[in-house]
Amino acid sequence: FLVLTVGMAVNGGAGAMAPVAIGAALMVMVYAGGHISGGHYNPAVTLAVLIRGRITAAEAVPYMVAQVVAATTAAFAVKYLIGDDKMPAEAVANGDAVKALLAEVLGTFALAYVVLNVATAKANAGNSYFGLAIGLTVTTMAYALGSISGGAFNPAVAVGVSFMKMAAWGDI
């Protein structure tokens, strides 16, 4: 649902409110799926949780595969719903791939930092705010860095937006 929300909000005319819709969608997804899968929707965050030792490699790999497959499927759904002719031309925001990569690394780091400290820290066991913190982090980073990189902060989303022609394959 995350890539579906990204594609529909950005291409469907949400304008400046798109990051709010995307952050809210992620928050809802974390609350809805957190008790089932740990709320793993981002391969970079899954890797961070693996490094922290909260999941095993045998758990992480299927999550990562599912994340990319789901993002790709959602991208094709968006293309069908909106129409290929209404999808944007391939581009990196501001045309500077190095700056875009740095922005993505920083935004992804911020997201992983928040996830590790609100959703996997022993001191926060049983908290009920982690979805809000995670969703607001994505919203904040999208507003702060989105004009530089497009604001994916998630390798699976980056694959999805490439299929939707919102970013060029060579810039992932």
Annotate each predicted stretch with a short phrase:
Residues 1-172:
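Membrane-interface helix-loop junctions and terminal tails of multi-pass membrane proteins
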